[in-house]
């Protein structure tokens, strides 16, 4: 019997990659429940904007907008969900500046227009809410009442990503067995 290695599920893995001569910082989570696995990827863009790549969304979604859609209304709530450390909150500044969305409802509408363009607004919003509940971190739950846990987990992932950028932590070793799952038949 041969074991198949895979990255650990439901764990935040941070990494720095060279893309076109530039360093790109990423945080990945393979959220898994029985029979379903969804990859969430957070990317720190060159201009300081943190975006999320979610299955079911053809475009990157600014993480501040995503956290607003999950129920955090104020900038202070979002910054506190990420970290209480001033240096990390300062790194979030450009993410706040580049986001025009100010309410939870506006954030859901923003996401809905990007994932289901050209459809009826009612259908767009339903699709966006389904994405938030089922496509985003399903291991934390698939109901609207699980959105608070999702914002906390997302905040933790953004914090770890910014800590990597600031040089406070090292990139996670993908080859370390602590970051892997070994699957066997049966």
Description of each model-found segment:
Residues 1-185:
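N-terminal non-catalytic structural scaffold regions of very large proteins
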């Amino acid at each position: 019997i041969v074991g198949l290695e895979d990255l650990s599920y439901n764990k935040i893995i941070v990494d720095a990659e060279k893309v076109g001569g530039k360093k790109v910082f990423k945080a990945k989570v393979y959220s898994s429940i029985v029979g379903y696995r969804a990859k969430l990827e957070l990317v720190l863009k060159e201009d300081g904007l943190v975006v999320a790549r979610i299955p079911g969304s053809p475009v990157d979604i600014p993480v501040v907008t995503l956290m607003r859609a999950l129920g955090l209304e104020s900038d202070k709530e979002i910054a506190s969900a990420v970290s209480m450390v001033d240096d990390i909150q300062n790194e979030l500044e450009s993410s706040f500046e580049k986001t025009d969305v100010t309410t939870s409802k506006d954030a859901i509408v923003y996401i809905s227009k990007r994932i289901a363009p050209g459809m009826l607004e009612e259908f767009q919003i339903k699709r966006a809410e389904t994405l938030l509940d089922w496509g985003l971190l399903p291991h934390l739950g698939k109901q609207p009442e699980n959105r608070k846990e999702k914002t906390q987990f997302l905040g933790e992932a953004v914090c770890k990503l910014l800590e990597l950028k600031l040089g406070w932590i090292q990139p996670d070793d993908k080859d370390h067995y602590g970051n892997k799952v070994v699957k066997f038949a049966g």
